[in-house]
């Protein structure tokens, strides 16, 4: 997903779902390569758990997400249901620095 905030800045979000907390996030080598290459940018991996929590990870963490169990990886933020969509958008598409 490509987001554009009100300042015209773009963010990239890779959306994933895990079936169990003990499983690994299903990321292809191509996805890992792209996210690793752009880990310094406003790029994220967003993972939904079976309990519907939304976990946000920095793109720089993509290799750990692919190789380690999901439950062993530390997200930037976890959002529970009901979701605060404004806060999620603020995290995923931050405004330009003043």
Task: Name every feature range the model reports, one short phrase each.
Residues 1-3, 8-20:
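Conserved catalytic cores of phosphodiester-cleaving nucleases, focusing on short active-site segments
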Residues 8-12, 30, 39-40:
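Short connector loops at helix/strand junctions that flank enzyme active sites
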Residues 8-12, 66, 89-94:
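Solvent-exposed, well-ordered amphipathic alpha-helical segments
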Residues 72-98:
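Charged phosphate-binding loop/patch that engages nucleotide di/tri-phosphates or the phosphate backbone
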């Amino acid at each position: 997903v490509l987001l554009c905030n009100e300042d015209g800045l773009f963010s990239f979000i890779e959306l994933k779902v895990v079936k169990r907390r003990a499983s690994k996030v299903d990321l292809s080598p191509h996805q890992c390569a792209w996210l690793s290459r752009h880990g310094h940018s406003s790029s994220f991996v967003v993972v939904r758990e079976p309990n519907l929590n939304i976990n946000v990870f920095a793109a720089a963490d993509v290799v750990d997400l692919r190789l380690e169990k999901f439950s062993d990886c530390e997200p930037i933020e976890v959002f529970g249901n009901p979701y605060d969509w404004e806060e999620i958008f603020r995290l995923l598409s931050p405004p330009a620095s003043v």
